[in-house]
């Protein structure tokens, strides 16, 4: 699995304004940016981003996932502290 594959799995399932993915062969770090995420609980945000990855995680292609979510306005303030992954 490559970064572009992970990005595609997520963006095919969810409409995001931005996505940033880092993957080292086992651990995946994801930053997802979309305004609708602001309406969800912390758990629901994680579940929303995690769900499209369930199959590759179950297949053992990804062993650990770290997810950070932001609305677009919060991302404008926070991106300097969160990039690069």
Region roles according to the model:
Residues 1-85:
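N-terminal, polar/charged subdomain of small-to-medium soluble alpha/beta proteins
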């Amino acid at each position: 699995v490559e970064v572009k594959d992970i990005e595609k799995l997520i963006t095919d399932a969810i409409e995001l304004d931005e996505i940033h993915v880092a993957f080292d062969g086992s651990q995946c770090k994801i930053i997802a940016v979309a305004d609708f995420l602001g309406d969800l609980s912390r758990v629901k945000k994680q579940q929303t981003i995690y769900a499209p990855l369930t199959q590759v995680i179950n297949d053992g292609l990804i062993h650990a996932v770290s997810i950070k979510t932001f609305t677009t306005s919060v991302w404008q303030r926070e991106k300097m502290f969160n990039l690069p992954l």
